[in-house]
Amino acid sequence: QGTRLYRSRSFDKKPQILEFNDLTSAPYEYAKQNRMSPAGISMFYSSLQAKTNLAELGPTDGVIVTGRFTLKKDVRILDLTSLPSLSYWVKGDIGEMEFLRDFSKEVSRPIDQDDRIHIEYLPTQAFTEYIRYRFKDDNGAPLDGIMFNSSIPNAGKNVVLFCNKEESSEYVDLTDFKIYP
């Protein structure tokens, strides 16, 4: 609760009025495939720093609007950015930790941003669906999202929340936005 998240979107021209719904998760019919979700599945993709969004969005012919959101509640996140080192002396399942480390590398691998269907996304999308619907924490509660490193070197950390356009308002408030020419 209270953590700032940033989400960017490109527009053809500078918008006259901006509202929460303009910057939150895409509606199902416009949700494109992403690292964690196939086309038609809406999730809230964000980062911990505005510069991360700008780096990932890349150059555009129009303007970029970056919204600063604040988490309204505590969320349960699988953090793939700070996994412990593997050691045979540490208690736990080495196989599971090795899988998470490999998955973390895979999800942060650069993939061309175009309109093609990227089969490279299929493993990360399948794992995300498993985490979203089947995985529970020690208290039996589902996870709310995943944090992972940006595919852009040294750009920062991304957070995907498992909430669609309608559910976004339960998780975040839009506190501010900035327009980049």
Model-assigned labels for residue ranges:
Residues 1-2, 7-37, 60-181:
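Active-site and NAD+-binding cores of ADP-ribose-processing enzymes
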Residues 40-46:
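A short, exposed loop/beta-hairpin motif centered on an aromatic-Gly-Thr core
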Residues 47-50, 124:
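Short, hydrophobic/amphipathic alpha-helical packing segments
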Residues 50-60:
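Short active-site loop/helix that positions an aromatic residue
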